[in-house]
Amino acid sequence: MYNVKLEVFEGPFDLLFHLIEKNEIDLMDIPISVILDQYMEYIKTLQEMDLNVASEFIVMAATLLEIKSKMLLPKQKFEGQQLEMEEVDPREELVTKLIEYKKYKIIAQTFKEMCKIGSRFFREEPEVKYIDKKIAFNYSSEDIYKAYLKVISKNNAKEDEIEIKKDEYTVESKIKELLVKLVKKTVLWFSEFIKKSRAKGEIIVSFIAVLELVRLNKIIAEQKTTYGDILIKSFGRGEKNEQ
C-alpha cells in the first residue's frame, strides 16, 4: 500500500495554467507539444487511479492535439512568386482564453485577500437578524471565469462528468486493440472502433487511446467536419502513398 498525492484542478484551464507556471512558459509562445505531453500524463494518471474524468478535460485534450496537428502542417510554397501573408497562429484562440482566465484568477485571489484583511477589522456580528452568520465566499478563479464565459456566450450547455472504470477497460488495452485492428485493415473509422462499446466511459477511454497514439506518431487521425466521424490509419501508410 502506498499513497499518491495528486493535485486537484478546478477545470482544464486551471490545469493548463498550472503547467504553464510550473514550466515558466511565456503565454505568448506556448510549446504545445510539451504542454500536451504533461496534460495527457495527468489525464492518464486520473484514469489509472480510477478517478472521474470530467468531459471538459477530454475536450481540452482534443483541442491541444488539434493545435499541435495544425502547427505540424508543412507551409505551402509557391513557385515563381512570394506571397507575404499574415499566418494565423493556431494557438491564438487558446492564448486569448488563457489571458482572460489569468485576469480573473488574479481578481479572485484579490477578493480572497480582501476578505482576509476585512475579517481582521470587522469582528462584530451583523445587526440584521435575517443574515445567515454562516455565509461565506465560496468561489474560485475557475468559477469566476466560467461565469464570465456565460455572460459573453449564449452557449449554456452543461458538460456531464463521465466515470471511467479501471476494472473494465484501460487506455493501454484500447491502444493494443486499435493497433491490432489497424494491422488487419488499412484504415478504420472511429465509429467502427467503438461499435461494441457498452458505456460512455469506454468510448472516452477509446478516444484517449486515439489521442495518445496520435501524440506518439503511431497513427494519423483525420476529421473532415466538426463533430464528424474520425478516420484512423497507421502512421506512414497513407503518407508514403501520397508522396
Swiss-Prot record:
GO BP term, pick one: chromosome segregation
Keyword Cytoplasm belongs to the record: yes
Disulfide bonds, paired cysteine numbers: none
InterPro entries cross-referenced by the UniProt entry: ScpA (IPR003768), ScpA-like_C (IPR023093)
GO cellular component, one term: cytoplasm
Protein's cellular compartments: Cytoplasm
Record's keyword terms, sorted: Cell cycle, Cell division, Chromosome partition, Cytoplasm
Oligomer and partners: Component of a cohesin-like complex composed of ScpA, ScpB and the Smc homodimer, in which ScpA and ScpB bind to the head domain of Smc. The presence of the three proteins is required for the association of the complex with DNA.
Homology family: Belongs to the ScpA family.
The protein's role, per its UniProt record: Participates in chromosomal partition during cell division. May act via the formation of a condensin-like complex containing Smc and ScpB that pull DNA away from mid-cell into both cell halves.
Name of protein: Segregation and condensation protein A
Organism encoding this protein: Thermoanaerobacter pseudethanolicus (strain ATCC 33223 / 39E) (Clostridium thermohydrosulfuricum)
Lineage: Bacteria, Bacillati, Bacillota, Clostridia, Thermoanaerobacterales
Gene: scpA
